């Protein structure tokens, strides 16, 4: 019998690879003759780069940028041929802050722009930005501001997400996700007024 472990990460506690290894270790302890394989997976949040780094042509690059509170940091991204993959959680991730009403009011997507610019300079023609696991609710305003006049005419920019919520409203991004990022009910109402 063959067993495949492909478990997504548990936010803030264990990576996909760690969970796969734990599951397979338990299975092999009970059934040592089984054939097992581990394949890390991700849903668009934490771990996207770890999963794609297994690709033969994956090249890890780094970019100097700022996190969601404006603190300097260096983050990895991947080049797969002329496609770059950027994991938002590495730049503006919820795990980078202690969430509170104060952090949600200061948190910005600004730092993503520097990573996109770095990927363009590295030759990327397609840039995939995984959108999960963030600690921001600025609707991408900081990201757009940081790009400024960057020429994107020869670049395809793709947002990778496992949700389909609209920008704002009853089922909008702020209504559904801002509370987990520290927003109060009043802040969520204000975020929903950004149209």
Feature map (PLM): residue ranges:
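N-terminal loops that bind phosphate or other acidic moieties
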Residues: 1-131, 135-195
């Amino acid at each position: 019998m063959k067993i495949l472990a492909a478990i997504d990460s548990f936010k803030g506690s264990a990576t996909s690879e760690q969970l796969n290894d734990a599951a397979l270790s338990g299975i092999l302890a009970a059934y040592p003759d089984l054939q097992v394989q581990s394949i890390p997976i991700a849903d668009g949040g934490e771990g996207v780069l770890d999963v794609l780094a297994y690709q033969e042509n994956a090249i890890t690059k780094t970019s100097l940028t700022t996190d969601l509170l404006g603190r300097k940091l260096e983050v990895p991204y991947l080049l797969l041929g002329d496609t770059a993959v950027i994991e938002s959680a590495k730049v503006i991730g919820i795990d980078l802050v202690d969430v509170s009403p104060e952090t949600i009011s200061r948190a910005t997507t600004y730092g993503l722009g520097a990573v996109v610019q770095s990927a363009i300079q590295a030759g990327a023609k397609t840039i995939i930005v995984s959108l999960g696991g963030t600690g921001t609710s600025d609707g991408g305003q900081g990201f757009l501001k940081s790009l400024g006049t960057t020429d994107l005419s020869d670049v395809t920019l793709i947002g990778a997400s496992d949700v389909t919520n609209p920008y704002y409203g009853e089922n909008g991004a702020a209504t559904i996700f801002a509370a987990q990022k520290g927003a109060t009910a009043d802040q969520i109402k204000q975020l929903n007024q950004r149209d």
